[in-house]
Amino acid sequence: MNLKKFPRHVLTFGPTPIQPLKRLSAHLGGKVDLYAKREDCNSGLAFGGNKTRKLEYLIPEALEGGYDTLVSIGGIQSNQTRQVAAVAAHLGLKCVLVQENWVNYSDAVYDRVGNIEMSRIMGADVRLDAAGFDIGIRQSWEQAMADVRAAGGKPFPIPAGCSEHPRGGLGSVGFAEEVRQQEAELGFKFDYLVVCSVTGSTQAGMVVGFAADGRADRVIGIDASAKPQQTFEQILRIAKNTAELVELGRDITEKDVVLDRRFGGPEYGLPNEGTLEAIRLSARFEGMLTDPVYEGKSMHGMIEKVRLGEFPAGSKVLYAHLGGVPALNAYSFLFRNG
């Protein structure tokens, strides 16, 4: 496998810490040892997150190609768009963000706080759009790029989650290589890794990265899109492409992609009772905050799998905390009593 052949523009601090979740593990019976890899602490650029790791492999193309405007898309509380805005500010580039109405959640402050507030503060041109949720290429995003060109600019396209970009999975291959290095220092290997999946490239890159040592199917994706078949197909397609790019040496098949479909409901961006319980448990036992859109759902999935005995006793499980906490502010009504 050859990741080093791709240029990387460093936007992160370095290897993210792996934190033992001792109190949460004990609360859930103590038969499984839970850990978290804190991607939510990976950068000083507006709180960072998994998209910042991905952007390290996209930004060289933007800089080398003389692009002057980063153009991205997401929901109103998109972590992706916040991280793109931060990178643009850091590099002195312009930024246009399309924020679609992906979540059926009504709150007077939903489009004024959290991620979207930070993007505005960082100087991004934020454009609200009424279109609903989908993980594919969007007409509103293409129109934003056309608008930049019409104004004499040179737009660099960054799709939702970086996922439709050919190099969108490379950062998560690097995540897997980083975990392997940390495992050597810890003196043990993780039996499973739990990660949230929506647009697919995070899990896809991890599948490829861990396929290098035979653990592709130990990457357990927790669907948060509530459109799991579409997400599964996108993970598989991106993983196949990424495996070819990094010269993995074998094809990625459906058996390599594990996506748990039980925890994404009722809709994208809307938490269920299990999501809310998981957010509170993580916060109250570990002081680790998660959000209702992504990490709360993957945390719910991990907790429930422990409760159901789906991880064998003695397993060491690594939870990939991808970020997303700024969105909590947009859901403040749900937590008005804690």
From Swiss-Prot:
Pfam families referenced in this protein's UniProt entry, alphabetically: PALP
Cofactor requirement: pyridoxal 5'-phosphate
GO molecular-function term, one example from the UniProt record: D-cysteine desulfhydrase activity
Signal peptide: none
Top-rank taxon: Bacteria
Active-site residue list: S78
SUPFAM superfamilies: Tryptophan synthase beta subunit-like PLP-dependent enzymes
Modification N6-(pyridoxal phosphate)lysine, positions: K51
UniProt entry keywords in alphabetical sequence: Hydrolase, Pyridoxal phosphate
Gene3D superfamilies membership: 3.40.50.1100
One BP annotation, GO: amine catabolic process
EC number: 3.5.99.7
Catalytic activity: 1-aminocyclopropane-1-carboxylate + H2O = 2-oxobutanoate + NH4(+)
Similarity-based family: Belongs to the ACC deaminase/D-cysteine desulfhydrase family.
PANTHER family: 1-AMINOCYCLOPROPANE-1-CARBOXYLATE DEAMINASE-RELATED
Subunit annotation: Homotrimer.
Role noted for this protein: Catalyzes a cyclopropane ring-opening reaction, the irreversible conversion of 1-aminocyclopropane-1-carboxylate (ACC) to ammonia and alpha-ketobutyrate. Allows growth on ACC as a nitrogen source.
Protein's recorded name: 1-aminocyclopropane-1-carboxylate deaminase
Organism: Variovorax paradoxus
Lineage: Bacteria, Pseudomonadati, Pseudomonadota, Betaproteobacteria, Burkholderiales
Gene responsible for this protein: acdS
